[in-house]
Amino acid sequence: MHFLDQAKIFIRSGAGGPGAVSFRREKFIEYGGPDGGHGGKGGDIIFEAVPGLNTLIDFRYTQHFKAQRGHGGAGSNRTGAGGEDLLIKVPVGTQILSEDREQVLADFTVPGQRQVFLRGGDGGRGNASYKTSTNRAPRQHGTGWPAEEMWVWLRLKLLADCGLVGLPNAGKSTFINAVSNAKAKVGAYPFTTIRPQLGVATHKGREFVVADIPGLIEGAAEGAGIGDRFLGHIERCRVLLHLVDASGDDPVGAYEIVRGELDAYGAGLADKPQVLALNKIDAVDAKTLDKLAKKLAKLGGGEVMRLSGASGEGLPAVLDKIIEILGPAPETTAANENDEPWSPI
């Protein structure tokens, strides 16, 4: 499935239906008086967070969403039928932003969360409601309240337990492939990963979701390489695994760049629990590893773990550490086997 983490859509609620202009007509009653009913209410635009989806790709092809207009009123004081609400389903973790992206209008963090986003217009008054002692046969009626409409941005922030960070070619994709069934693309060149990947890791009977974001570069927090978008995906991760390529030209400098970008981005990223690990240790001698570990420990103020995503060396210890930070697994409810396939509407 292709990953898309933002989409712009147009939404419009239903306008209210017009009130009716009608007069009572019965045998032997010459002047029956007005009996036009009110128009029906327009449909609402409702968003709902649904589980089981991690992309906004469907909104690339369906961009306009319009709820049904309310039906017109009728004689005999009959109110028109209300317009049908339009339910738009989004992945859990979706935010709705204003067109200028300056304001978060809604944030869907829980499966099943619903919000009436645009309210349908009220129906117009029928002519019966305009009758007065001086105007017994009114012909005016309400046309119904107009619909609400706007362009909004949908932005998806992945909900994962552990987020992988590091410079390009730090071995993040190899790691997520080694601990899960993510099947992320791996290559011996930077920027092999060009979109976020999710994988479910299982270790000692404990499952947790791992998010692999594309490698960061200097200036990512300000948008370089659209790194600000990628950093947004790890805002909700409970722990970060910072991988440093031990075989790189300057592992210490690589650590400092990523750490600086986390600090610059804000949103509490730099304060999240973090596991720091030297990767690709099978390509470096033990003496060099010891020196690097000491330097990084002094900078990071904590334990520096060692692993090789390619050979699997050190992976169990790193997974143990992640599980220790995550704590006990939350209780989950079994999915309903009769659930319908996902659709944006």
From Swiss-Prot:
<comment type="similarity">
    <text>Belongs to the TRAFAC class OBG-HflX-like GTPase superfamily. OBG GTPase family.</text>
</comment>
<feature type="domain" description="Obg">
    <location>
        <begin position="1"/>
        <end position="159"/>
    </location>
</feature>
<dbReference type="GO" id="GO:0005737">
    <property type="term" value="C:cytoplasm"/>
</dbReference>
<feature type="binding site">
    <location>
        <begin position="308"/>
        <end position="310"/>
    </location>
    <ligand>
        <name>GTP</name>
    </ligand>
</feature>
<dbReference type="InterPro" id="IPR027417">
    <property type="entry name" value="P-loop_NTPase"/>
</dbReference>
<dbReference type="InterPro" id="IPR005225">
    <property type="entry name" value="Small_GTP-bd"/>
</dbReference>
<comment type="subunit">
    <text>Monomer.</text>
</comment>
<keyword id="KW-0460">Magnesium</keyword>
<feature type="binding site">
    <location>
        <position position="193"/>
    </location>
    <ligand>
        <name>Mg(2+)</name>
    </ligand>
</feature>
<dbReference type="InterPro" id="IPR045086">
    <property type="entry name" value="OBG_GTPase"/>
</dbReference>
<dbReference type="Pfam" id="PF01018">
    <property type="entry name" value="GTP1_OBG"/>
</dbReference>
<dbReference type="InterPro" id="IPR031167">
    <property type="entry name" value="G_OBG"/>
</dbReference>
<dbReference type="InterPro" id="IPR014100">
    <property type="entry name" value="GTP-bd_Obg/CgtA"/>
</dbReference>
<feature type="binding site">
    <location>
        <begin position="191"/>
        <end position="195"/>
    </location>
    <ligand>
        <name>GTP</name>
    </ligand>
</feature>
<dbReference type="GO" id="GO:0003924">
    <property type="term" value="F:GTPase activity"/>
</dbReference>
<dbReference type="Pfam" id="PF01926">
    <property type="entry name" value="MMR_HSR1"/>
</dbReference>
<comment type="function">
    <text>An essential GTPase which binds GTP, GDP and possibly (p)ppGpp with moderate affinity, with high nucleotide exchange rates and a fairly low GTP hydrolysis rate. Plays a role in control of the cell cycle, stress response, ribosome biogenesis and in those bacteria that undergo differentiation, in morphogenesis control.</text>
</comment>
<keyword id="KW-0342">GTP-binding</keyword>
<keyword id="KW-0479">Metal-binding</keyword>
<dbReference type="InterPro" id="IPR006074">
    <property type="entry name" value="GTP1-OBG_CS"/>
</dbReference>
<feature type="region of interest" description="Disordered">
    <location>
        <begin position="121"/>
        <end position="142"/>
    </location>
</feature>
<feature type="binding site">
    <location>
        <position position="173"/>
    </location>
    <ligand>
        <name>Mg(2+)</name>
    </ligand>
</feature>
<feature type="binding site">
    <location>
        <begin position="166"/>
        <end position="173"/>
    </location>
    <ligand>
        <name>GTP</name>
    </ligand>
</feature>
<dbReference type="InterPro" id="IPR036726">
    <property type="entry name" value="GTP1_OBG_dom_sf"/>
</dbReference>
<dbReference type="GO" id="GO:0000287">
    <property type="term" value="F:magnesium ion binding"/>
</dbReference>
<feature type="binding site">
    <location>
        <begin position="279"/>
        <end position="282"/>
    </location>
    <ligand>
        <name>GTP</name>
    </ligand>
</feature>
<dbReference type="GO" id="GO:0042254">
    <property type="term" value="P:ribosome biogenesis"/>
</dbReference>
<keyword id="KW-0547">Nucleotide-binding</keyword>
<keyword id="KW-0378">Hydrolase</keyword>
<protein>
    <recommendedName>
        <fullName>GTPase Obg</fullName>
        <ecNumber>3.6.5.-</ecNumber>
    </recommendedName>
</protein>
<feature type="binding site">
    <location>
        <begin position="212"/>
        <end position="215"/>
    </location>
    <ligand>
        <name>GTP</name>
    </ligand>
</feature>
<dbReference type="InterPro" id="IPR006169">
    <property type="entry name" value="GTP1_OBG_dom"/>
</dbReference>
<dbReference type="InterPro" id="IPR006073">
    <property type="entry name" value="GTP-bd"/>
</dbReference>
<dbReference type="GO" id="GO:0005525">
    <property type="term" value="F:GTP binding"/>
</dbReference>
<feature type="domain" description="OBG-type G">
    <location>
        <begin position="160"/>
        <end position="327"/>
    </location>
</feature>
<keyword id="KW-0963">Cytoplasm</keyword>
